[in-house]
Amino acid sequence: MMRRIAAAAALILLLPALAAAQDLVSLCERARHPAVGAWSEFKWVGGRNDGATIRMSIVGKERREGADYLWMEIVMRDFPMGSGRQQAEAPRRMISKMLVPGFGAGAGSPRAAIIKLGDLPAMEMPVGQSRMGAQGAPNLEACQNAKVVGWESVTVPAGTFRAIHIVGANGRGDSWVAPNLPFALVKEVGNDEGQSRQMVLIAHGMGARSLITERPQPFDPRLFVEMMSGRRPAPKP
C-alpha cells in the first residue's frame, strides 16, 4: 500500500512537468512559422557581446516549387567583428535577409540570402555562406531535445511573461519560452568563454518591414571581404 501511495505521489509531482513538456511541443511547433510582420528584439547582457542587439522579423513570404517560404530578416547591431583596428572600422550594423522554410532548424538551409553591412550596398550571398548572418540569433534547437523544468514567471525589459523554463540537452544554458511571442524566446542564460551572459527580450510586435529597400548587387568575393573588414569599397569606374 505504501508503495502505491508513493507512486501516486510521485506521479502527482510529475504532472506539472509532463504538462509543460506537452505545452513546449505545441509552442515550438507554432513558433516555427511566425506571422508576416512579426518581430522581436533581444539584447545581450554580459559576455563578449555585451550591449549588442538582435532584431528578428518576418518581412514577407514567397512560394517556390510548390512550397511556402518566409523572408526572415535579422538586424545585428554592435556585435564585435574582427579584432583591433579591423574591429574598430567594421560596420556596427549588419542586416541578413534569408528565404527559409521556417524559423528553427530550417533557417539553416535558406533558398536565398541577402546581406547589407552598415550603409554599404546590399549584396546577394551564396546560400552555403548565409548562416553567418544568423550567428548569435536565437533558435529553436532547444525545443527538440530540451529538459523541461516547468512553467515560471520571468521578467525582462519587454515585460513579465509566464514561460516554460527549459535546460539544454547538454545541461548547459537555460531558456524561457512563451506562447504568443513571434519567436517564443523570452530569456536565455549561458556561459560565453567563461563569462556569464544573458540574452533578453526587450521589445516585440507586428508591422515589420524589410530595411533592405534597394536591389542587391550580385555576390563579389573581393568586395565582400573589403566590406567585412570595414574598408569602404572603391567606386566602380
Task: Set out the residue ranges of the language-model regions.
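Bacterial N-terminal signal peptides that target proteins for export
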Residues: 1-9
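Bacterial N-terminal signal peptides
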Residues: 8-16
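Sec/Tat signal peptide C-region and signal peptidase I cleavage site
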Residues: 17-21
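Acidic, serine/threonine-rich low-complexity disordered tracts
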Residues: 22-98, 113-237
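Phosphate/oxyanion-binding loops and surfaces in catalytic or ligand/nucleic-acid-binding neighborhoods
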Residues: 101
